Amino acid sequence: MIEFGRSVRWFNDYDSEVEFCKRNGFDFMQVWYKDGVLLYDNMSEPKEKIFLEADFPIIIHALFTVDDYDKYGEDLLRILKFLRHKEVIIHPVQNPKNANNETMYKLVECNKRITELFYNYGIKMYIENNSRLDHLNYTPEDLKLVFNSSPKTELLLDIAHIDSYEHLQKIVNVKFPKCLHISDKHFSVVHEHLPIGHGELDFSCIFLKHLKNYDGKIIFEVPSENDDDIIKSKEVIQKILFN
């Protein structure tokens, strides 16, 4: 069953974000975690208590460097257990200045360890593919290393991180995703996330050819303060999937 979510706008009042989701048919929100902190402006601590009491589903999207797996992995697990979550996203990132030929192999080991840790608590782990901006977990070969080492890890495919439809198909051939980040982009731009229809991605081609019969989570990463941009993005994808 397809579930529709969206990345929370952490500069807005949280109750307003929840109400926006309920009015417009979003099933859950994505909340970011970075440097040991759940990201939300003007929210008192502990934030996880407020998210729990709001009684609206969220999924945590953690930005981790290879060092962060050991530094923050246990804290992330603590939060997931408190929220009674059964899924989490880790988006591996690395400053190119701090990366070398061994960095990808370190990521493979870190991912395997944390997937096993979370699995022991009944938590499914998604790892996100990168754009060429990061040069880490970006190529199909990178992803193959990850999933060969840790078959229990699931793929979160960020559509806006592809270089071409061929790149997309090669990733899908490695592992079919069970979760998607959706936004638009121009192929000439290294890293870009736009409302659907503001770039040049052909989502009919993507869903009817490369992701045919997709049945999982769809998270809209539409960086806009304009509600209509988010609503219309969802409507475009629903029309492709359900008409």
Predicted features by range, described:
Residues 46-61, 110-118, 146-150, 203-211:
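Alpha-helix-loop-beta-strand connector modules within alpha/beta enzyme cores
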Residues 1-3, 15-22, 69, 77-86, ...:
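Histidine-acidic metal/acid-base catalytic patches
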Residues 26, 57, 124, 154, ...:
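Hydrophobic "anchor" residues on beta-strands that sit immediately upstream
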Residues 7-11, 32-36, 61-65, 93-95, ...:
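Active-site beta-loop-alpha junctions enriched in small/polar residues
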Residues 1-81, 243:
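N-terminal pre-domain/capping segments
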Residues 105-132, 228, 234-239:
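Catalytic cores of phosphodiester-bond-cleaving enzymes
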Residues 83-101, 126-131:
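Active-site groove signature of glycoside hydrolases
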Residues 37-49, 97-111:
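Active-site-adjacent beta->alpha loops and helix N-cap segments on the catalytic face
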